[in-house]
Every structure is written in structure tokens, then in C-alpha cells.
Amino acid sequence: MKLSEVKKYCSIPLEIIKDCEFEYTYLIGKALKKDKVISFVGSPKFVDGLYNYETEGVICTKDVYEVIKDTYTGGIAVAENAKTAFFEIHNYLGTQYEENEETYIDPTANVHPTAIIADKNVHIGKNAEIYAHVVIKEGTKIGDDVIIREGTVIGGPAFYYYGEGDGRRLVTSTGGVVIGNNVELHANCIVEKGVMFENTVIGDNSKLDNCVVVGHDTIIGKNCTVAGNALFAGGVNLADNVFVGVSASVSPNVEVGTGAKISSGAVVTKNVPEGMQVSGNFAVEHKSFIQHIKSI
């Protein structure tokens, strides 16, 4: 589709400076996993990021256009509020790419009668155990030998809004959830679906304790162990064999290396290298944290 074809779905004026064809919306700053994407830039201070990614076009403000007009070769559309225009187009695209496949539950799976499973676009693998009051929404794929305990909700929309004040609107979550084989989710976990046509993923053999929140587009690797009340904000990336302690929280887009450990109660705001243990609020290397505690 073209920018000129979707401008009618914006509630604010959108001036097409140069048209382009595209397929997906995507946010600058995240690794591109789709071809033919458009993004938005709402301030000149973020212009440099535009040149680090291969985009078909951009929605931008007038002041951003003045900066990029002689150097950016893709399509350009100008709006007073580029972010709002971008997400309104994104929400429209979400209605165009909806799948419509009948839900499949393997005959060997055991699903409690009080569980609520969407009629469309869900796949549940062999020998899965779905306990009472579990909710599984559209766009969820669950592997073999998975256990999902009471009250867990999988595939709900991301907590992701655009706009200001009483004009805030929910961004349509156009991705899904993929859960690998031999995964266990204990009671009352929340797993949000991806926002930008990508999936939230929990890898093979990972185990999540009660009340863990897995934000949109988070990737939890294989063989990870996550204790109760841990929280992963959007876009977190855990490599394999990571341990996360009780009530730890990990900020958006943080990357945690293979075999790393996050101590109980830690607030992680920076990337964690492979094999490192971090502790504290804000989290630092565990040895440094202990030395600091001893010094006070």
C-alpha cells in the first residue's frame, strides 16, 4: 500500500511530500525484522536514527522535514503530530493483516472446562496442560508438553498508548505470543502479545513462577528460570539459561546475556553481560553491590 492510500485513516491532516509503498509500521531504534516499513520521527534530535535503518518512508513533523528533505531518499509525509498519524495508520494496518485460522488443540492436550480459549488463531500442542480459568487469546502458539496453571492470561494487548490526556488511545497489538516446548507458567502470569507485527516469545524449557508479567515483544530464551512477581517491560531480551529472582523488574529493551543472574528485588535498567550477576536498585554487578552495602 501507499502513504497516499492510508492518509484517510488519520484524524489529523497528513501532507504527502513524496509517496512510497510499504507493508508494515515499525519503530526506529528497534532491530528491523520486517521489510518495507515506515516509521516516524517527531523531533529533530532523533533524526540520526532514521539513517541507521532501512525504511521505505517516514512520517515526520515540519521541522524534521526541513532537516531531512535534501538527504532522505524515502517517502515523506508531514503531520503536526507525527506520532499520532503513525499509530493511526498502524492501527488501520492491524485490521488488514488479521489472520482467520480455526483454533487447533491437539487431542492429547488436557484443557480445563473453565479455561477460555479464542476460537481463532490459537495453536496448542501435544500433552499441554491448561488449568482452570486460564485465558488464551488470538495469536498464541503453544508448544508441546507445556503447563499453564490457574488464572494465567496469554495474548492480551500490550500496555502501549499514544496521544495525550483524554485523547490517549490504545495501540493495536499486531503481533502474537509464541511459547516453546516444555515451558511452565505458574498461576496468574500475564504474557502480552507483540505490538509491531512481532511476537512475544518464551523459549523451550523455561519456567515462570506465579504472577510474572511478560511485557510485549519480550523474548525469554531457553532454560530460563523466573521467580514470582518478576516483571519484564516491553522489548526485554533474555538469552538462554538466565535466572531472575523474586520481584525483580527489567526495564524496556534491556538485554540480558547468557547465564546471567538477576537478584531478588533488582531493578535492571542497563544491559547485563553474559554470566554476570546484578543486584540492587538500580542494579549493578553483585560484587559491587555487596561492597557498597558493607561500606555503609
Provide a role label for each language-model segment:
Residues M1-T108, D145, G151-T152, G156-L170, ...:
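Terminal amphipathic alpha-helical/low-complexity segments used for targeting or macromolecular assembly
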Residues F40, Y104-E285:
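Structural signal for interior beta-strand "rungs" in well-ordered beta-sheet cores
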